[in-house]
Structures are given as structure tokens and as C-alpha cells.
Design a protein with these regions (language model features):
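Buried hydrophobic positions in well-ordered alpha/beta secondary-structure cores of metabolic enzymes
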Residues: 38, 50, 87, 110, ...
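Gly-rich Lys/Arg/Thr-decorated short loops/hinges at beta-loop-alpha junctions or inter-strand turns
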Residues: 159-162, 167-174, 225-238, 341
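Conserved phosphate/anionic-ligand binding catalytic regions in large, soluble enzymes, centered on
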Residues: 34-42, 88, 193-214, 313-323, ...
């Protein structure tokens, strides 16, 4: 679906309202986890076969928000999402509004899912998860999700990871638009300080302190550098966010840039995170097309240009980012030697 460039706040809000209505009209949703782990287990084959089967049955398949959906028609949506957790049980398929969750799904299971569940309203026990005594049909029945309150990951697994309209329907870019038109840079910094936000890795630096240092810098040109290629073995924190909700990162970078007086940013993605890199680049292109990145964003007079590069740090973060921005290659031996001293 071609995106129209938005020229004002009013145009953004009208578009967001339309996205919300279309999203709400999808009263039947099928979510196929297409995070890296599920993709390696054949998730795209499942997604493609589901799409073919639904179309063969003559069911309306709203694959992309805003297309193939006539007024009054039942909304039937098929979505490829990012990771929602429980990777050892993938590929995962979830069906709403029942909330039914299937694990270890294969392409061979698709016809049974369509016939029994989609058309017949029947849960397939053999594809369900167990807690030792009974089949757990929904996420609410699983201890894995007990006590979880998702904020950064709120939309991961809930939207198509490659669709800007769905992100906007779930309130993404609303915070940026508010900051853009209703707040001064100092008010943004104060809000971040009051929230008590800290870094999620390393020493857990206070975010507002780092932002204030950048805002106070008087250099003629400042650049925002974001590292999405953490080396914490097995953590995949950055990858999960970028794969499942890339517009969340872009909105965050845009708010930082606004608060600190920055007009250019670089996001570095681990070279092995190919899905994350692809989705972040696609999200960047979508945001540019919609007028949420670039020059004179929404007619505000503010500019922010984003670049996405594949890169991996082998030096402490601050040194790596500065060297990389200046096209200087780091020396692996220096990093490994220092890391054990």
C-alpha cells in the first residue's frame, strides 16, 4: 500500500484515526510468529500456506491493513509478527479473538487449522501447550506470561512487524508528535528524568543525564548513534525489539533527536541480525514516505534523517561508535585484550 506524505499534525491524527478503525474492524486475526527462531523453523512456509488456503476457501484475507477490506465485510487478518517469547515452542500461531495458541506448527498442520479452527471453531489439542496436567489453550493459561507487564515490547507479537499503519494504529509516533508540537526540548528532558529511565545493559546509566549532555553540546553538527548489536551472549534484547517493532526504535530516536537538537542519526544493527536489519530499513523507508522522517517533519520545521547500517562493535561502545561514524576500522585484538584485563 502506497503511503501518502503527511504535511501536518492534523493530517497525521486523521490518518491515525483511520488506521485505528481499520485495525479494529479486523475482528478475526491470525498471528504467525516470524521472529528469527520461528523463521528458521519454517514460519514463512506456514504464513504462505495459510494465505493460500484462506483465499482458496473464499475467505476475505486482509493481509495488509487497509487493503482487501470493504465496508461491512468481516475483517480477516493474517499477520507475520515479531517474537512474543517462548522460542523453544516455535513456530507459534495465535488466533484471535479466542486467543488460541498453537505450538510447534508445521506447514502440514495448516489445512487442519483452517478447517477445524478457522472454519469449525474447534481447538486442536495436539498443537496446544501443556502445564503438566492439562492443555493450555491461551497465553493467559501459561505461567510464562504471569506477571509480565510489557512496555517496550507492548506491540511485539501484536502487529505485523513490517507495517507502519498497524504500528500507528497501536499509538506509535503519537509520543513523537506530542513532543514535536506540544513540548520544548527542556520539557522532554524533564519528562524523561521524571520517568527514571535507565539503560537496559551495562552500568544502567540514567537516560536523562546522557540526553542533557548531548543537548548541552554546542557543536555545529551533532549525530545520534544507536547500537543495536549488543554482544551480551544469548540476550537478543535489541534484536527482539527491532525485529518485532522497528517503528518503536525509530520513534525513540526521533524524540531523542528533538530533545537534543540533532538532525542526523545512525542505527547500527548486528550483521548477523539480517531480519532485524531488513525490517528496520523497511520501517525507515515507510516513515520517510509518510513524512515522519526527513525535512520539515509534519510541517514543524524540524528535520531528522536516519541511516541504518550493519555493524558490530569490537571496542567499548563509545569508542566504537565514534570511530565507525568516522569510517575508522577498530582492532579486534585491542578489544579482546582489554576485556580480560
Amino acid at each position: 500500500m502506497e503511503l501518502k506524505k503527511l504535511e501536518s499534525r492534523a493530517e497525521f491524527e486523521a490518518w491515525q484515526d483511520a488506521c485505528k478503525k481499520r485495525f479494529a474492524a479486523q475482528n478475526r486475526k491470525i498471528f504467525v510468529c516470524c521472529g528469527s527462531v520461528c523463521l528458521a523453523e519454517g514460519a514463512m512456509k506456514i504464513y504462505s500456506k495459510l494465505k493460500e488456503s484462506l483465499q482458496r476457501e473464499g475467505l476475505l484475507c486482509d493481509v495488509v491493513l487497509g487493503t482487501h477490506l470493504e465496508d461491512g465485510a468481516p475483517g480477516f487478518a493474517l499477520k507475520k509478527t515479531g517474537c512474543s517469547g517462548m522460542c523453544d515452542n516455535g513456530p507459534l500461531v495465535r488466533i484471535e479473538p479466542e486467543g488460541w495458541l498453537y505450538r510447534k506448527v508445521s506447514a502440514d498442520d495448516v489445512e487442519e487449522i483452517v478447517q477445524k479452527t478457522i472454519l469449525g471453531g474447534e481447538y486442536i489439542d495436539r498443537l496446544g501447550m501443556g502445564n503438566g496436567t492439562e492443555v493450555c489453550k491461551t497465553r493467559k493459561d501459561l505461567k510464562f506470561f504471569d506477571g509480565q507487564t510489557r512496555r517496550v515490547l507492548r506491540n511485539c507479537g501484536e502487529i505485523d512487524a513490517e507495517n507502519l499503519e498497524e504500528a500507528v494504529a497501536r499509538d506509535e509516533y503519537s509520543g513523537f508528535v506530542k513532543a514535536l508540537f506540544d513540548m520544548t526540548p527542556e520539557q522532554i528532558l524533564d519528562t524523561v528524568a521524571e520517568a527514571g529511565l535507565r539503560g537496559r545493559g551495562g552500568p544502567g546509566n540514567i537516560s536523562a543525564e546522557k540526553w542533557r549532555k548531548a543537548a548541552a553540546c554546542t557543536d555545529a553538527q551533532k549525530t545520534l548513534l544507536v547500537n543495536d548489536g549488543q554482544l551480551d551472549v544469548g540476550s537478543y534484547m535489541d534484536r527482539t525489539v527491532v525485529e518485532g517493532d522497528p517503528h518503536r526504535l525509530i520513534e525513540g530516536m526521533a524524540i531523542v533527536a528533538l530533545a537534543c537538537g540533532i538532525e542526523e542519526g545512525y542505527a547500527y544493527v548486528h550483521p548477523q541480525y539480517q531480519v532485524a536489519e531488513f525490517r528496520l530499513k523497511k520501517a525507515k523507508e515507510q516513515a520517510e514516505a509518510a513524512g515522519l522522517l526527513g525535512d520539515n517533519i509534519l510541517g514543524s520545521g524540524k528535520n531528522f534523517h536516519l541511516h541504518v547500517n550493519a555493524g558490530m562493535r569490537t571496542l567499548p561502545e563509545r569508542e566504537f561508535l565514534k570511530m565507525s561514524a568516522n569510517s575508522v576500522h577498530s582492532n579486534k585484538k585491542t578489544w579482546y585484550a582489554n576485556s580480560y584485563m
